[in-house]
């Protein structure tokens, strides 16, 4: 059996990653592949919580820029994350992985309400728990949700699964060929250098709770498993100052 470095994880998946090459909506082929990747880690006995973004369907900031009330636009974004969570739940259960979707906004016909102790109990029973609906409050990103849930469930690490990005760079490597990838950073480094890995609220919370982040390319098969085993891929952001 493979050696596991992280026993309980939060996996943060961007909405764009679920859209595949289309860029918007949900690609069933991507869901199937991602479910397979998560199953590899699940079968190693790792306890898994998943936070999905909603950017493949809607962004609250975009709605606000178009004239919508920001809070209303953010609630729409929260609903988008729940739709993504339902799609991923279906993919995982089709792959044979018991899964529970918990939402911060009550919708009992489709998901459980988020309750911290229940979520931990599910994980201890080897069920994957998907956290939908963000924090349940406007103005907070799903990155902040990932940092918050990681703290609440005592996760060992937050895995920032990026769509085609294999780590944190000094600049956008697509625009600057001389950009260098960081092997390791601290949360304070990330904030002081203005690196756009996650928003400042999420970064500050992760720094306060000392939970490390690993930024890696989720599109490479086997990468989630490699990270959990401790292989040095991507960029690790230490949970200290």
UniProtKB/Swiss-Prot annotation:
Activity regulation note: Allosterically activated by GTP. Inhibited by UTP.
UniProt-annotated location(s): Cytoplasm
Protein name: Uridylate kinase
UniProt-annotated binding residues for UMP: 54, 74, 135-142
Subunit-structure text: Homohexamer.
Lineage top rank: taxon: Bacteria
CDD domains to which the protein is assigned, alphabetical: AAK_UMPK-PyrH-Ec
UniProt gene name: pyrH
